Curated annotation (Swiss-Prot):
Belongs to the HrcA family. Signal peptide: none annotated. Negative regulator of class I heat shock genes (grpE-dnaK-dnaJ and groELS operons). Prevents heat-shock induction of these operons. One of its GO terms (molecular function) is DNA binding. InterPro entries: GAF-like_dom_sf (IPR029016), HrcA (IPR002571), HrcA_C (IPR021153), WH-like_DNA-bd_sf (IPR036388), WH_DNA-bd_sf (IPR036390), WHTH_transcript_rep_HrcA_IDD (IPR023120). This is Heat-inducible transcription repressor HrcA. It comes from Corynebacterium jeikeium (strain K411).
Length: 341
C-alpha cells in the first residue's frame, strides 16, 4: 500500500472521528465527500471505510447506517493530534484572574474544576494534594494566654493545621520566639517525614540537658503535638464539578457511580507522575466502571514536585483537542499560582 493511500485513509478516519464528535451521529461516505476536501470519489471513500472497519478503527451499528469510531479509532485520532486548540488571550486572562482570587489552596482547586467543567461541558475532577510530597513552609506559635498558644503548621502544598496547645505552665514573651525559632530550624524546607524525625530529636533534647532549662517543659509539649500533627495523613479527597453533564448520557451511569465513590478516580489520578497530559479511552481504563468513558488528566504542582492530579471525565466522543487544551491551561495556571505562594 502506498504512503499516499495510507495518508488518505488516515484523513478519512480523522474526518469520521471529528464528524462523530461534532454530531454524535454515524458518518457516511456522502457526508464525508460533502464536508471534507478529500479529493477522491465517494466510491474510493467507501472502500477506505471498509478497510478501516476491517482493521478495527471504525464499526457499523446497522447495515444501512454510517460508521462510528471504535476505541482503537479514537486512540489513533488522539495520537495524531499535533496541535491542540489554543485558548484565546482573553480566555487565558480570565482563567488566571478567576484562579488568583482563590483565598487558599482548596478554594483555588474548587475554582479550577468549576472552570474545567464550564470550558469542556464535562465532569471535572481534582485531587487534593498528596501530603507525603509536601514540605514544611513555616510553623507559627501565637500566644493566646499565659498558658496557651495557637500552633499553626503550614506546608508548601497549602495544607494548614492549627492546634490549641495547653502548655501546662506560663511562657514568657521572650521565650516564645526562641521556641518558634527552634521548631522552625528543625522543620522548614524538609519533607513531613524528615520534619517529624527532627522534631522527635528535638523532643529528646527537651528531655535532656542540651536545651535551656526554661524551654524544656514547654518544648516537650509543643514537639509532642507537632509529631502527632506531622504523622496525620488525611484521606485523599476529590473535588468534582459538572456531574450533571454526565447525567445526560444513560450509558455513563456507572461512571457517575464511580465518581461518587471516588476510589476509582483517585486511583487513576494517583498514577499521574508529571505535568504531561494523559488520555485514557474507553476500554483502555483498567477499572470497569470507567470503560464507557474517556479521561483526560494531568498533574499540577509547585516548583518542587507534582502535588496531585486533575482532569476531565466524559464520553468517548468528547472533544479531545479542546479538552486537552483546557486541562493543560488550567493545570498550568494552578501550578503557577502554587509556585508563587
Amino acid at each position: 500500500m502506498s504512503s499516499g493511500t495510507e495518508h488518505r485513509r488516515n484523513q478519512v478516519l480523522r474526518a469520521i472521528v471529528s464528524d462523530f464528535i461534532a454530531s454524535h451521529e454515524p458518518v457516511g461516505s456522502k457526508m464525508l465527500v460533502d464536508r471534507h476536501q478529500l479529493g477522491v470519489s465517494s466510491a474510493t471513500i467507501r472502500n477506505d471505510m471498509a478497510v478501516l472497519e476491517a482493521e478495527g478503527y471504525i464499526t457499523q451499528q446497522h447495515a444501512s447506517s454510517g460508521r462510528i469510531p471504535t476505541v482503537k479509532g479514537y486512540r489513533r485520532f488522539v495520537d495524531g493530534i499535533n496541535e491542540v486548540k489554543p485558548l484565546s488571550t482573553p480566555e487565558r486572562r480570565a482563567i488566571l484572574d478567576f484562579l488568583e482570587h482563590g483565598v487558599d489552596l482548596e478554594d483555588v482547586l474548587r475554582r479550577s474544576v468549576q472552570l474545567l467543567s464550564q470550558l469542556t461541558r464535562q465532569v471535572a475532577v481534582v485531587q487534593m494534594p498528596d501530603l507525603r510530597r509536601g514540605r514544611v513552609k513555616h510553623c507559627e506559635l501565637v500566644k493566646l494566654g499565659s498558658h496557651r498558644i495557637l500552633l499553626v503548621l503550614i506546608t508548601d502544598t497549602g495544607r494548614v493545621d492549627q492546634r490549641n496547645v495547653d502548655l501546662g505552665q506560663p511562657i514568657s514573651d521572650d521565650d516564645l520566639p526562641r521556641l518558634r525559632d527552634l521548631v522552625n530550624s528543625a522543620m522548614v524546607g524538609r519533607t513531613l517525614d524528615d520534619a517529624c524525625t527532627n522534631i522527635a530529636a528535638l523532643a529528646n533534647e527537651a528531655k535532656g540537658n542540651s536545651m535551656p532549662e526554661e524551654l524544656r517543659d514547654v518544648a516537650l509539649v509543643v514537639t509532642t503535638v507537632l509529631v502527632e500533627t506531622l504523622l496525620e495523613r488525611p484521606n485523599d479527597r476529590l473535588i468534582l464539578a459538572g456531574t450533571p453533564n454526565l447525567m445526560r448520557t444513560s450509558e455513563l451511569s456507572p461512571v457517575v457511580e464511580a465518581l461518587e465513590e471516588q476510589v476509582v478516580v483517585l486511583k487513576l489520578l494517583n498514577s499521574v507522575r508529571d505535568l504531561q497530559v494523559q488520555v485514557s479511552i474507553g476500554e483502555e481504563n483498567e477499572d470497569e466502571e470507567l470503560r464507557g468513558a474517556s479521561v483526560v488528566s494531568t498533574g499540577y504542582g509547585n516548583a518542587n514536585a507534582v502535588l496531585g492530579g486533575m482532569g476531565v471525565v466524559g464520553p468517548t466522543h468528547l472533544d479531545y483537542s479542546g479538552t486537552i487544551s483546557s486541562v493543560t491551561a488550567v493545570a498550568h495556571y494552578v501550578s503557577r499560582i502554587l509556585s508563587e505562594e
